[in-house]
């Protein structure tokens, strides 16, 4: 049986997974570093890299045990090799290369963003092409996924990523880290129309986005408030999340128009939202309604596959394994690596 080992270490989650040729996830271990970074209110790159170094061996042993797999049963090793915090990327990539060399099994360097981009093919087995909204703490872009290694970026944030905006606003409100889930939780208790926030470049007519001005508006409001209690926090969270939903809904419409100009896929119209922000239930509902108006189906992975994980890396490795797209061991990890720069 073909088994793919995936390794993910691009940010603050140490993850290892094994999947089969039939897209079955045998094991998917994630060791979170949230408690290590919470005191700093964000991820500290050096701490993250050192934690990956100490966690990877344990994660690998747990995955092998849980999946009842021997190292010699592994067909290939796929590892995130960029983009991301370069210290962690190097640790994970070198760990994978060492296994590849020792086991004499192929190594496959995976673009972390491609892992997110292909997750819906792992979970829903959807065909190419499809429209992707990649929304996470480090990235926010609309992508036409035309095939394996064939990606066309239709638009991106011109400043902050949407996930970063969630985390920064949560920090302003003294909510726990990571901030995205905390904002969503508080928003359920608040009034989404209490505060009116700006929607930067919403009428630009293209697929680019901006969240910096929104973040600044929230900060200004908080600074000018005389009292901040739970009710105020809930209302700010709800109003902020509502505004994000308005921005993304508008930009999805722009992205659909741009996507349809470069594809002729009018039978199976799918929009995929991937990345940590895809776990937000409110945004799932809002964007599903928006997609339906245009005859599209919105697909989002289960929560445990929205955030960083190694199953998506293993699956991207499986697609490349099936196409014999292996990577030489002298491949250099990259802190920056656009989807459009992936080479097959």
UniProtKB/Swiss-Prot annotation:
The enzyme class is transferase
Q: Name one Pfam family in it.
A: TsaD
Q: Where does it reside? A: Cytoplasm
Binding residues annotated for substrate, in chain numbering:
134-138, 167, 180, 280
As cofactor, the record names: Fe(2+)
Q: Name one GO cellular component term.
A: cytoplasm
Indicate the principal place this protein occupies in or around the cell: cytoplasm
Which residues does the record give as Fe cation binding sites? 112, 116, 308
Q: Which CDD domains match?
A: ASKHA_NBD_TsaD_bac
Q: What is its EC number?
A: 2.3.1.234
Q: Which reaction does it catalyse?
A: L-threonylcarbamoyladenylate + adenosine(37) in tRNA = N(6)-L-threonylcarbamoyladenosine(37) in tRNA + AMP + H(+)
Q: Supply the InterPro entries for this chain.
A: ATPase_NBD, Gcp-like_dom, KAE1/TsaD, Peptidase_M22_CS, TsaD
Task: Give the protein's function.
Answer: Required for the formation of a threonylcarbamoyl group on adenosine at position 37 (t(6)A37) in tRNAs that read codons beginning with adenine. Is involved in the transfer of the threonylcarbamoyl moiety of threonylcarbamoyl-AMP (TC-AMP) to the N6 group of A37, together with TsaE and TsaB. TsaD likely plays a direct catalytic role in this reaction.
Q: Record's NCBIfam families?
A: gcp_kae1, T6A_TsaD_YgjD
**Entry protein name:** tRNA N6-adenosine threonylcarbamoyltransferase
Naturally occurring in which organism (per UniProt)? Rickettsia africae (strain ESF-5)
Classification lineage? Bacteria, Pseudomonadati, Pseudomonadota, Alphaproteobacteria, Rickettsiales
